[in-house]
Amino acid sequence: MRVLPATLLVGAASAAVPPLQQVLGRPEEGMSFSKPLHAFQEQLKTLSEDARKLWDEVANYFPDSMDHSPIFSLPKKHTRRPDSHWDHIVRGSDVQKIWVNNADGEKEREIDGKLEAYDLRIKKADPSALGIDPNVKQYTGYLDDNGNDKHLFYWFFESRNDPKNDPVVLWLNGGPGCSSLTGLFMELGPSSIDENIKPVYNDFSWNSNASVIFLDQPVNVGYSYSGSAVSDTVAAGKDVYALLSLFFKQFPEYAEQDFHIAGESYAGHYIPVFASEILAHKNRNINLKSVLIGNGLTDGLTQYGYYRPMGCGEGGYKAVLDEATCESMDNALPRCRSMIESCYNSESAWVCVPASIYCNNALIGPYQRTGQNVYDVRSKCEDESNLCYKGMGYVSEYLNKAEVREAVGAEVGGYDSCNFDINRNFLFHGDWMKPYHRLVPGLLEQIPVLIYAGDADYICNWLGNKAWTEALEWPGQKEYASAELEDLKIEQNEHTGKKIGQVKSHGNFTFMRLYGGGHMVPMDQPEASLEFFNRWLGGEWF
């Protein structure tokens, strides 16, 4: 998860941008929440007096600069490439015209969904041009939503092993508003980027035994662009369904394989929605078999109760916060929970936005002000301008090279790892605190769900992730909640028997704690990451 620079504490992304390391000052006297959000003035007039007082209190968390910040993301500079540049263009309108006879002899669309406004542009990339996995087939391109001027960039890597039989995985980074290409080059892709801004082969890439699609979503993230904005998870889900439907239509050889969705951080919001969107379509060409969420934000009501324990030494690492701060966080938690409960009951932005801002300032803010890395309790924030990691700066510099943008067919003038306008959009639409965990029981009825967590992360810590999985109401809750954590050991290489974490599972639900992993487990523990990933895809726990 990421947060807004120089505006407010929104949560997980806030730790690494310099202005966010400071206590946010009170606005000038008399300022109310309606001042920075002029578009909401009329709506504010309809609120009760108590509600308006709450919003005015929330305004205290905003610096004056918020008054000059746009609420919606600005369009990126871009130059669209001619159709002749692409090897294939799959038009959703053509796919919608394909009808088949069902088992009852009735005509129906081959693929469900409203796809007519979408096109998928595809180019076979030349791996030798960049030196990234040169022996692996790659495709790059854009999903175009022509009706809304949205263009999502993707990069596909075929499996290094047996692409005709290996599964296909969609990888999503979080934010909201952070590029999945950071996951590609910092965590689990075929190459990382070193301090010389050169690609370095990754022996532990997740495409070792699976084909992987990295998607820059929502729009205006990474190489993606738009003249409009997406500001909630549900809207983004429609785009992902269209991308997969058209991609698998063009490449039926991949559609035959098992398909999984994996992601981390704010993908704890995305994935339940995206998977539910896919499963809602009876006639689909997406063979969804499971989902994997790493260090995710999924159930804020439960998870926010574990910031104090994690920061105060109860998560397996020494305390970062002092006793007085821990007590202050304990005192703030009841009000935070009450506000989140109200958000869950109404799912209204008017309730969910104050809950997000109050809780993040009360329970994440104290940790941020220590200067410690919110993504890893063991270390200081080493590079405040790049979300605590120098490597993110290397990735951005690499992806901004003209020759790289040309090689992958990027149409934007520049690349940013995270777009904080998008982050703000999701916040102000109330998306941050909405109860997307309520979709998980429906998923468990149809597919396995893995929740994994590096145990050194603060922002989406393992204590909170374990707790929400045990609190989730579903038919197998009692058996799952009572199951004990068991040792997770390496089985597939020369380090056989090495303990890499703990696991518990019942039915379709599995939780893993990964030792020594921060917010980005594949970066911190690449061997352990590939181990559990391969075994999960192999069906060991389901």
UniProtKB/Swiss-Prot annotation:
Pfam families (UniProt xref): Carbpep_Y_N, Peptidase_S10
Protein location: Vacuole
Main location group: other
Broad enzyme group: hydrolase
Keyword Disulfide bond attributed: yes
GO MF annotations, alphabetized: serine-type carboxypeptidase activity
Active-site residues (renumbered): S265, D457, H519
Glycosylation sites: N209, N508
GO cellular component annotations of the record: fungal-type vacuole lumen
First and last residue of the signal peptide: 1-17
Top-level lineage group: Eukaryota
Catalytic activity, as annotated: Release of a C-terminal amino acid with broad specificity
Alphabetical list of Gene3D superfamilies matching this protein: 1.10.287.410, alpha/beta hydrolase
Entry keyword set: Carboxypeptidase, Disulfide bond, Glycoprotein, Hydrolase, Protease, Signal, Vacuole, Zymogen
Disulfide bonds: C178-C418, C312-C326, C336-C359, C343-C352, C381-C388
Record InterPro entries: AB_hydrolase_fold (IPR029058), Peptidase_S10 (IPR001563), Propeptide_carboxypepY (IPR008442), Ser_caboxypep_ser_AS (IPR018202)
EC number in record: 3.4.16.5
GO terms (BP aspect): proteolysis
Maturation-removed propeptide residues: 18-123
Family recorded in the similarity comment: Belongs to the peptidase S10 family.
Primary role: Vacuolar carboxypeptidase involved in degradation of small peptides. Digests preferentially peptides containing an aliphatic or hydrophobic residue in P1' position, as well as methionine, leucine or phenylalanine in P1 position of ester substrate.
Name of protein: Carboxypeptidase Y homolog A
Organism: Aspergillus oryzae (strain ATCC 42149 / RIB 40)
